A protein has these predicted regions:
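Multi-pass membrane proteins that catalyze or facilitate reactions on polyprenyl-/lipid-phosphate substrates
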Residues: 1-276
Length: 276
């Protein structure tokens, strides 16, 4: 459980398989009507809800930036207001497409090991290609220079990063990988691409966690009890707190290659260990 929660806190690429054959009865309303609620449904909700721990870690690590965003929302920081608008614009594609397609994608591909392994390999190749392009050309945006500050990001670039985040709906695709690659293509430096990715994750995961707490919170607690949920949040918080700052520093100096090769190794392991 602790290892799984650590992966989730790091926005890992390992998918959690639903246990669709196990069911429990849960009360749906005051009239004692009940419906079947699978352990798989509870586990899926759990995976999303414990991201509250990772959210808390990002808030602590980026509290100054978040404070500027808050000041911007009340008209006291122009740069904070611009960043808030960009984050909202980047969030909207995933919010809209997620509501329309997430359940369909999960139903069709959630248990498909080949789809997961393929996404791991394709994602790795994209990371290697984009990283080589960045290093060889010193720029990958249509602008003549690389953005050096999140203040330089435009609404159009933010929306583009938001569409990259939608790619993470495909099982085996990392949300952070997709948005960092999107940030590269938008012209951000590795450091600022990672920072924007984490801030966007704060918005996206907060919305997803809040939605699952409202829609599935009571049933999830009945299925899994409260202690594993609290433990999951704590472990996700600690692992994210330890990893995020290291990740940003490493990415600034070395780029994405290491994580691309990790995905390839992981894809091989997934096929060998879980393939049929």
């Amino acid at each position: 459980l602790i290892l799984m929660n650590s992966y989730l806190g790091l926005d890992g690429d390992i998918p959690i398989q639903d246990q669709k054959g196990e069911y429990i009865w849960v009360k749906e309303s005051a009239d004692s009507t009940a419906r079947l609620y699978t352990i798989g449904e509870a586990s899926y909700a759990y995976v999303i809800v414990i991201q509250a721990g990772a959210i808390a870690a990002v808030i602590i690590l980026y509290w100054k930036t978040i404070l500027q965003i808050a000041l911007g929302c009340i008209g006291k920081s122009p740069s904070g207001r611009k960043l808030a608008i960009n984050l909202i614009c980047a969030f909207l594609p995933a919010a809209a497409i997620g509501l329309l397609l997430n359940d369909l994608i999960e139903a069709k591909l959630g248990d498909d090991i080949n789809a997961v392994a393929g996404a791991l390999v394709i994602g790795a190749l994209v990371m290697l290609l984009v990283e080589r392009w960045r290093k060889n050309n010193k720029k990958i945006s249509v602008k003549s220079d690389m953005s050096t500050n999140l203040d330089d990001l435009t609404v159009c670039q933010s929306v583009m990063i938001g569409f990259f985040q939608c790619i993470a709906m495909w099982p085996g695709t990392s949300r952070s990988m997709a948005t960092i690659v999107g940030g590269y293509i938008a012209g951000l430096s590795p450091k600022h691409a990672a920072e924007f990715s984490f801030l966007l994750g704060l918005v996206t995961l907060s919305a997803a966690s809040g939605y699952k707490i409202v829609s599935d919170g009571e049933n999830m607690i009945k299925a899994l009890e409260i202690r594993p949920i609290l433990l999951g949040c704590l472990v996700a918080f600690i692992s994210a707190l330890l990893a995020v700052k290291w990740f940003v520093n490493y990415l600034s100096k070395n780029g994405l290659e290491l994580f691309a090769w990790y995905r390839i190794v992981l894809a091989i392991a997934v096929v060998l260990l879980l393939g049929k």
